[in-house]
A protein has these predicted regions:
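Domain-edge interaction signal
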Residues: 2-191
Length: 191
């Protein structure tokens, strides 16, 4: 059934003359990491918060005890670190030890090539929404500038407000990879 829906959407987009693309999880992370002149992203949790707050996020999230979490995003970050696209460094920022994620030289090249290839196209998000890539880039940059480098507690206050407004159920049965993520957030997020 979803193949039929996707074919129908593709047909409509093509008839409208819209050149569209779909992005992989790694490409979404790449676009966020490259935003704001490729400034480092402070804290792994920042990736999760930004994509959680982004209304057109391609990732599925659940709310853990102290932060939103996406297993898909977690796996993308690991693959990008393992593949040499992202570099992780430990830094002291405002007297706190944190992880800083930035694009490697290879990652910067991949980012520039991707951005040039897709800039004038539309992106199909979650097989539902079509957005101009230029808008997506601007939105990700705005979110990065707004939330990157914020203390975890300030982001948690935002999350709590979002949770209260959207009636999320807190899931207390955690899997091992979720527990590992929480440990990293607590260690490097200043909790």
């Amino acid at each position: 059934m979803s193949t039929v829906n996707n074919e129908w959407k593709k047909s409509v987009l093509e008839k409208a003359g819209l050149q569209y693309i779909t992005l992989t999880g790694e490409e979404w992370v790449l676009l966020l990491a490259g935003a704001d002149s490729s400034s480092p992203i402070l804290g792994e949790y920042t990736f999760h918060f930004i994509f959680f707050l982004y209304p057109f996020s391609p990732f599925n999230f659940k709310t853990l005890l102290i932060a939103p979490y996406s297993e898909q995003l977690d796996k993308c970050l690991k693959r990008m670190l393992d593949g040499g696209i992202l570099i992780k460094e430990i830094k002291v920022v405002n007297t706190m030890v944190t992880e800083a994620y930035k694009l490697s030289l290879k990652g910067n090249t991949v980012y520039r090539n991707l951005k040039n290839k897709i800039y004038k196209k539309q992106v199909l998000i979650n097989n539902h929404i079509v957005r101009p890539v230029a808008n997506v880039l601007n939105e990700l940059e705005s979110l990065k500038k707004t939330y990157n480098g914020r203390e975890l507690f300030k982001l948690l206050a935002l999350l709590i407000a979002k949770v209260k407004n959207n009636d999320f159920a807190l899931e207390l049965r955690l899997q091992d990879h979720e527990i590992q993520y929480l440990k990293r957030v607590i260690r490097y997020g200043g909790v």
